[in-house]
Amino acid sequence: MRMPSAISIGVFAGLSLAASAVPSLRKNGTTCTVIPLGNGQDDVPNILSAVDECGQTSGGRVVLPAPYTYRINQRMTTHLTDSRLEIGGTLLFSDDIDYWVNNSYRVDFQNQSSAWRITGHDYVVDGGPHRGGVDGNGQLWYTWAKGGSNVFGRPMPVHVFESTRATLRNLAIRQPQFWAVLVDSSSHINLDNFYVNATNHDSSVSPEGEWVQNTDGIDTYRSDHITITNWVYQGGDDAVAFKGNSTNIHVENVTVYGGPGIAFGSLGQYPDRTDIVENVTVRNVRVQPSFQRAMNSGVYFKSWIGVNYGVPPNGGGGGHGYVRNVSVENLRLKDVQLPVYIDTCLSYLFSENITQYCDTSTYEFEDLHFRNISGNGLATVTDYPGKNISFAVALLCSEKAPCTDLTFQDISITLPGNYTGKHVLCENAEVEGLPCNS
């Protein structure tokens, strides 16, 4: 995005200082415009008032214009019906970690939480031509979590919840506290032209200073008919992830810098739940490392061990369900550690002896089709429980639930010239189009 000139920065400063001299909420017909209060004051009450006045009226508009920055000092739910929320400016979440840990909305998955819920129907959230959006103040959270996985209390900045027939577009999410976007219990949602960037600047967080775990770009959960197009993601975790009961999903034109790429999962974590992921198309995706984070994989599938060991978020397992009717097309790889793989031995209890449960999963993967995948792998992954999986493709399916109907067409993945191992590993997998274990 083009940086503002010195003149525009000066204008911004003047507008910010003068904000208190003009009404912070102005209404003109069915359009409500919010001007920030400034001086670190909470803008949530005025934003919610604008939504009440203009966001629930047919044809209504709530406008948060550029170049303003709006302070989000408390959780908020914006309920929109037949209206538009235009975010030309930036929603900046406060640095009050104690508040967010204790007051964010709870999410019914892995004891997670969110800071901003968007609910309703037939609405548009638009960042405009310069991509307004969100600043999650994420560095505070990356340092606070200090490399821990799924640390309780880190809220997601954008939570599309119980929404139908909605479009979110032209949005930038910088430094998200946790996952950038969660689409949850929703249907017929279009998300187009997003930029997500999670970058750690604190070298004390990990030896390499690269830690940006749990900063997914977007996750879908209990949602149907979701379209994700024209995304750029830079971070350290899944760019796009499909959680349980994500159906009829279309993903196209996604560029990924760093992290594990496109993820199906995690799935089967809860023994009392059935997780279904079905009818998913992923097309035209490019993946490569960022300046800070390796590219772990291009596309991968992950289900939990088949016994319930430990408790969520990092333990669990024994759940049921299936991934079915998936098409992955036109995947371009650059310097990817493990381009394509299936993992049915998932647990985040790394200090435990999980290898004894690696063939216990009854979660099913079937009818998965891969076409036109090219680029290079690094053959550097060695940390799968009890195995070296330095391959281009590793399909590690459970003995209790073999993977069936996996097809590959036009696959061209090169490995380093000095690599002498196998290129493809198949365990308990019915595969067509690839020479298994060769």
From Swiss-Prot:
One of its GO terms (cellular component) is extracellular region. The active site is at D237 (proton donor). It catalyses: [(1->4)-alpha-D-galacturonosyl](n) + H2O = alpha-D-galacturonate + [(1->4)-alpha-D-galacturonosyl](n-1). The keyword Hydrolase applies. SUPFAM superfamilies: Pectin lyase-like. Keywords: Carbohydrate metabolism, Cell wall biogenesis/degradation, Disulfide bond, Glycoprotein, Glycosidase, Hydrolase, Polysaccharide degradation, Repeat, Secreted, Signal. PbH1 repeats lie at residues 186-222, 223-244, 246-266, 277-303, 323-344. The keyword Disulfide bond applies. It comes from the Eukaryota. Residues 1-21 form the signal peptide. InterPro entries: Glyco_hydro_28, PbH1, Pectin_lyas_fold, Pectin_lyase_fold/virulence. Belongs to the glycosyl hydrolase 28 family. This is Putative galacturan 1,4-alpha-galacturonidase A. It comes from Aspergillus niger.
